[in-house]
């Protein structure tokens, strides 16, 4: 384990987003994200949801099971 920070190569926030189409498909995405200045939590959610659900036709209009967006620092 190292104590060197790697925040410069990561976004300002860490997210986890899980969506599901009951009986068809589910997916989870996680990573770092830097919202543009003035963006809201809703703005970030909409971008992340569109990226995840746009990656597979089976996820179109999927239900959100879990969403977390927090500052990416310990």
Where are these regions (language model features)?
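Short intrinsically disordered terminal tails
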Residues: 1-6, 70-74
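N-terminal acidic leader/helix
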Residues: 2-37
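Compositionally biased, low-structure terminal segments
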Residues: 15-16, 46, 68
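Prokaryotic Sec-type signal peptides and long signal-anchor helices
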Residues: 18-19, 49, 71
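Generic "edge-of-domain/loop-turn" microfeature
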Residues: 22-24, 38-40, 69, 74
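Amphipathic, hydrophobic secondary-structure cores in small proteins
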Residues: 27-52, 57
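Short, mixed-charge low-complexity intrinsically disordered segments
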Residues: 53-74
